[in-house]
Amino acid sequence: MTAGQATRIGELLGVPVTSVRTAGAQHGYQHLTARLADGRQAFAKAAPGGDEATAEAFAAEANGLRWLAEAGAVPLPRVLGVSRDLLVIELLPDGRATQDAAEEFGAGLARMHAAGAASFGAPWPGYLASLPLDNTPGTEWGSWYAEQRLVPYLKKAHDDGALDDADLSLVETVVNRIGELAGPPEPPSRIHGDLWAGNVLWSGGRGWLIDPAAHGGHRETDLAMLALFGAPHLERIMRGYTGTAPLADGWRARVPLHQLHPLLVHACLFGGSYAAQVRAAARVLLTGS
């Protein structure tokens, strides 16, 4: 199996592969590490016999990595090659998160957000794990977020039985009140879009972004997701961020709003074990407690 994958990677990159190892799997993709004949090391996501959805997902991730890197604010691995069945990026050596690196990462994240986007959404179809994201451009964040980040996943989670009728009604109330909950208008920011702690790789004394669902979005979305799944040294990340780009008044009260989308996605992917968190986030938004 790995011999065939080594051949495919070598063909894609135009460089022979001297060794390849499996490195687990996630969302139906095989993870591989490879050493190239020119001395470079690479990480690959592989989907043997990839279909149209796989091709779109790999293209979206490659586009996102390149687009975020254009800001020159936070380091990202270089895209070495992308095809219908492979995404290959540079392999980064493992490091550890330090407080200073976390603060520097927060400042860089603020600068990346400030690089902006042409609109909310993106020119390419999006994916989050195995789920498609509608990146149709919009000009007003609240309605865009409600219609393209909340409603589709609320419906799927309910249809799949992960959320019950009461949960559906509760989140629909949030959607209907999005205008008052969304906060003051902000221009589209250049955001990662899936910024849980596992998508920050600490290497060489810096925080690197990997595996984005990049698009023009609200900058508070990335910060809320870092908080949702426990980023290391979060206080220092926030210090670096707010010291570079202060947040609008009331941002803490909006954290559950920005967390609703990833919670709904997790309910779609993993089932009803996330229903209580969806419910809690919606209730805090509607009642303040």
Task: Outline where the language-model segments fall.
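An alpha-helical support segment within catalytic cores of ATP-dependent transferases
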Residues: 2-10, 117-190
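Conserved N-terminal boundary motif of the eukaryotic protein kinase catalytic domain
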Residues: 14-21
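A general structural signal marking secondary-structure boundaries and capping sites
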Residues: 72, 113-120, 157, 182, ...
